[in-house]
Amino acid sequence: MANMFALILVIATLVTGILWCVDKFFFAPKRRERQAAAQAAAGDSLDKATLKKVAPKPGWLETGASVFPVLAIVLIVRSFIYEPFQIPSGSMMPTLLIGDFILVEKFAYGIKDPIYQKTLIETGHPKRGDIVVFKYPEDPKLDYIKRAVGLPGDKVTYDPVSKELTIQPGCSSGQACENALPVTYSNVEPSDFVQTFSRRNGGEATSGFFEVPKNETKENGIRLSERKETLGDVTHRILTVPIAQDQVGMYYQQPGQQLATWIVPPGQYFMMGDNRDNSADSRYWGFVPEANLVGRATAIWMSFDKQEGEWPTGLRLSRIGGIH
């Protein structure tokens, strides 16, 4: 499916690029000839402003040609180097918060054409623990961001009670799996975040996330628990809701596997949000094909204090920097 914004950007760049070339190689030489003739006739007494009036550049041509370099730079940077994204939900808390604006490294997993996202040059593959932006497999118009937990060939098991992972690499060949990956967890501690639950006037249930000092409470709120999860040599923080249990019946059940156990097929990945009880991820809809990968999240370049679907109430400049 074509990326409409990228398609419009490519078309605009091509059109303005043609105007730039036409001006540079056809109209500009003719203007210079007329200006030189006028200057010679006036005995070299004409200034630059007068010369421009002698051979003026049409407004439409000047606008199109002047916009081309800007559009070309935007197209190249956005398509092949870095693209900005906004975090719209709390599924990657505490690593990424609602209102964070991030930079995504587009060349991390391959150089792709900007319209259809077909890989032109392979540059790498997701590593375990990478924070990945990808096209949602069930609706490629949507961009999702999650952490790569399972790589091709991994056997991933999630315990919905302890909320812990078990990962065994090398299971896709039909032979015995390799030794389990060291997955360790720190002790559970109260986090800085409280999740609130309420209903709008129409009866629709809503939820919000607020940073609240540990010695304070918030009405209709539950303080989330936090712990460190280490997958091999990658450590990050995760959040859980103390009283929540996963809706295991809604898990994606892979044919031939027990519920809550998945073997990642070749060329696909198992993605999970760091906010484990508030993330719609591979547990519920399955794997992410390599063709859906957009890039790797690398940095926060701006952050607004806001709730999902609401206007910002302030800036969080302290969050600007690298993502881990």
From Swiss-Prot:
<dbReference type="GO" id="GO:0004175">
    <property type="term" value="F:endopeptidase activity"/>
</dbReference>
<dbReference type="GO" id="GO:0006508">
    <property type="term" value="P:proteolysis"/>
</dbReference>
<dbReference type="GO" id="GO:0005886">
    <property type="term" value="C:plasma membrane"/>
</dbReference>
<dbReference type="InterPro" id="IPR036286">
    <property type="entry name" value="LexA/Signal_pep-like_sf"/>
</dbReference>
<keyword id="KW-1015">Disulfide bond</keyword>
<keyword id="KW-0378">Hydrolase</keyword>
<dbReference type="GO" id="GO:0008233">
    <property type="term" value="F:peptidase activity"/>
</dbReference>
<feature type="modified residue" description="Blocked amino end (Met)">
    <location>
        <position position="1"/>
    </location>
</feature>
<keyword id="KW-0645">Protease</keyword>
<dbReference type="InterPro" id="IPR019756">
    <property type="entry name" value="Pept_S26A_signal_pept_1_Ser-AS"/>
</dbReference>
<feature type="disulfide bond">
    <location>
        <begin position="171"/>
        <end position="177"/>
    </location>
</feature>
<feature type="transmembrane region" description="Helical">
    <location>
        <begin position="59"/>
        <end position="77"/>
    </location>
</feature>
<keyword id="KW-0472">Membrane</keyword>
<feature type="transmembrane region" description="Helical">
    <location>
        <begin position="4"/>
        <end position="22"/>
    </location>
</feature>
<feature type="topological domain" description="Periplasmic">
    <location>
        <begin position="1"/>
        <end position="3"/>
    </location>
</feature>
<dbReference type="GO" id="GO:0016485">
    <property type="term" value="P:protein processing"/>
</dbReference>
<dbReference type="InterPro" id="IPR019533">
    <property type="entry name" value="Peptidase_S26"/>
</dbReference>
<protein>
    <recommendedName>
        <fullName>Signal peptidase I</fullName>
        <ecNumber>3.4.21.89</ecNumber>
    </recommendedName>
</protein>
<keyword id="KW-0997">Cell inner membrane</keyword>
<keyword id="KW-1133">Transmembrane helix</keyword>
<dbReference type="GO" id="GO:0004252">
    <property type="term" value="F:serine-type endopeptidase activity"/>
</dbReference>
<feature type="active site">
    <location>
        <position position="146"/>
    </location>
</feature>
<dbReference type="Pfam" id="PF10502">
    <property type="entry name" value="Peptidase_S26"/>
</dbReference>
<keyword id="KW-1003">Cell membrane</keyword>
<feature type="active site">
    <location>
        <position position="91"/>
    </location>
</feature>
<feature type="topological domain" description="Cytoplasmic">
    <location>
        <begin position="23"/>
        <end position="58"/>
    </location>
</feature>
<dbReference type="InterPro" id="IPR019758">
    <property type="entry name" value="Pept_S26A_signal_pept_1_CS"/>
</dbReference>
<feature type="topological domain" description="Periplasmic">
    <location>
        <begin position="78"/>
        <end position="324"/>
    </location>
</feature>
<comment type="similarity">
    <text>Belongs to the peptidase S26 family.</text>
</comment>
<keyword id="KW-0812">Transmembrane</keyword>
<dbReference type="InterPro" id="IPR019766">
    <property type="entry name" value="Sign_pep_all-beta_subdom"/>
</dbReference>
<dbReference type="InterPro" id="IPR000223">
    <property type="entry name" value="Pept_S26A_signal_pept_1"/>
</dbReference>
<dbReference type="InterPro" id="IPR019757">
    <property type="entry name" value="Pept_S26A_signal_pept_1_Lys-AS"/>
</dbReference>
<dbReference type="GO" id="GO:0006465">
    <property type="term" value="P:signal peptide processing"/>
</dbReference>
